Amino acid sequence: QVAEEAARLFLHENALNTAAFPSLGEIQAELCAWTADLLHGPPEAAGFLTSGGTESILCAVEAARERAAAERGVVDPEIVLARSAHAAFHKAAHLFGLRTRVVPVTDDWTADVDAVADAVGPSTALVVASAPQYPQGVVDPVAEMAGLADSVGANCHVDACMGGFVLPFATDEDPDAWGSPPWDLGVDGVTSISADIHKLGYAPKGVSVLLHRSRELRRYQTFVFDDWLGGRYATPNLQGTRSGLPMAAAWAVVRHLGRDGYRRLVRATLETADRIRAGVRAVDGLSVPGDPRHHLLSITADPAADEPVNIPALGEALAARHWHLDRQGPPDGLHLTVSAGNVPTVNEWLADLSDAVVEARERGNIDPADDGSYATLE
């Protein structure tokens, strides 16, 4: 109700020009400041709101490219990123003319720091770290990766679109069980970070925060043009028109919940995720790769089991019970994003998982579906 009422009040406002709608400028500034404080940003940290995680990533890549060209004269810029990094970084490289240097992950599914060190060089514009990475839900070694970026004067962006509104509260609630190594703007060498309020911040789609360590770094994100007949045109992201609706709704939700509210939601979420992981690992033939501590995890076949479960068959059996889990791979897996909304149904899900495993074994092996984790092709 809080989000809906705020959205109704800002149904027609446009954040393209915050001089015309000053309340949207104040909303953006307050959300960026609140998030910067949460993510240990220095006093000079600054940011903008975007429409979501992908746009935040696109803007971070563009800013890194512009800085590398302006300050170091880089003409053939590269992004160094792990194979686990979000596909939006490859989309950004495609759109903005950067090359990608993809490095492997280690046995624990985090970025291989030695491989990052080998890949970083004079053409590096950006090193990407994830907190957590999406496929297996583990946090990259951000401090080491940021140090390597800083050694060549490159940006280091932390993709915390999934974790920005979870990891800080997880550490507060139980640092031993749910804590992470340093990963945010408190890490030297991290130049930008993104966190989606419309994911585990529980705001409506779509609003994300993209923060830079300083206003000086943020300016590389902004496009300014006045050599036409319409006056000065300046935009901080890829959109022109920006709906005020999601911005206002996000502001209302953050103000309503506050840190205490988010702590309660995160505790409930992570207790539920722990139950799910334990339930999956208790099934002979299934595995949870890596050591995810938070709200993301993948279900894969256990290669050491006498009778591994066929994951595509398991996915179809769960779908028949009205549980939609994104398919991913390699390796073949089913992806889960746990939120506070899953708390009331975790017992039902675990019971259905047991039944679905039996059905999958009876059905036998089927080939992976030829579709994406999240894709719209028509």
Question: PLM ranges: what are they?
Answer:
Residues 172, 176-294, 300-305, 377-378:
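Active-site C-terminal subdomain of aminotransferase-like
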Residues 23-24, 48-54, 81-83, 290, ...:
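Active-site nucleophile and cofactor-binding loops and adjacent substrate-binding regions
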Residues 1-25, 29, 33, 263-266, ...:
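Non-catalytic terminal extensions of PLP-dependent enzymes
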Residues 35-43, 360:
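Cytochrome P450 catalytic-domain "roof"
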Residues 43-44, 290-296, 329-334:
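Short Gly/Ser/Thr- and Asp/Glu-enriched loop/turn motifs at secondary-structure junctions
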Residues 66, 72, 274, 298-299:
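Glycine- and Gly-Pro-enriched alpha-helical subdomains that act as flexible
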Residues 44, 51-224, 228-232:
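Conserved PLP-enzyme active-site core in the AAT-like
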Residues 37, 62-66, 251-256:
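Short glycine/serine- and small hydrophobic-enriched flexible loop segments
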